[in-house]
Amino acid sequence: MPTSVARTGGNLPNGAFIPEIWAQRLNDKYYAQCFLPEITNSNYTGNITGKGGSVKIRNRPTVQINKHVVGAPIKYQDITDTFVELFINQANEFAFQIDDVDAAQSDINIMNELTIDASYQAKIAVEIQVLGSIYGDAGVVLPPTAITSANVLAWLIQAEVALEKANTPPSDRWVILPPEIGGMIQLSDLKNVYMTGDAKTILRGEMSNGRIGMIGSMEVYISNNLTTIGGVTQCLAGHKSAVTYASQFTNLKTLTLQDYHADAIRGLNVFGFKTLIPGALVSLPATYPAIGN
């Protein structure tokens, strides 16, 4: 029943001639930004055969360099072969149904709207799982730090130094932070050139959704998908080669249900991830004043 203007008297008292109007445009819905394609590699996605499979990834052997001694016999090294294994051992699913009557009477394509939402939610769910796991694999772990706009630069430079010492290539380095720390960066001496007028500012590059530029050689991404435990957020820095990730929707079906007058869609997303180079991954546990939810 629509809300009517207050009235007195007996003329048209029930509001029967005031229609309810439903907008065809759905209310805007916002989704967490996802950055797995930017911070991990997907070199082995083509090897996925389904949940329960695995991919053996061979490591390049290390050749020893010895000093040459004139007249001494040459010593030939026994080469050690090693590998790591990427297990496709995780899966997420979704399933929903729309009654035929609802589909026929609706003025919007409900199935299409729900499918769009499912695609976003699937990406977010996987990213939360990956980010919530790989920080435990980091070869470098900084001490928990209370971050402010005064110390955020020194804190981030520690991560850059760790990546330099690991000999990671300058390209494809990254750091992923919560929005609050992103805000501190913009309030600090790292603020971008448009705010400071300083062509030598450390924070540089174009700003886009979830990306606020570069600090040193690290792309800076802002995410709501980081893990927080006991008030400590597990921020991460690394190189794209550090973690490999493989994912596929192996079972996406549209069904006509047998026992109901309804259609349904269900999907199965199988995936796996593996830290290949722990030294190219830095854990930056941080505390900060939270804003909002």
Where does each model-flagged region fall?
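Short Gly/aromatic-enriched secondary-structure transition segments
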Residues: 70-77
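Short, structured patches in soluble enzyme cores that scaffold and shape functional sites
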Residues: 90, 100, 177-179, 269
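A short, polar/proline- and glycine-enriched secondary-structure boundary/capping micro-motif
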Residues: 68-69, 108
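Extended, solvent-exposed, turn-rich assembly/linker loops in the middle of proteins
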Residues: 138-207
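Sequence/fold signature of self-assembling virion shell proteins
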Residues: 2-42, 46-64, 79-88, 95, ...
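Alpha-helical scaffold segments that mediate packing/assembly in large oligomeric complexes
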Residues: 100-168, 283-293
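Short coil/turn connectors at secondary-structure junctions
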Residues: 52, 93, 170-172
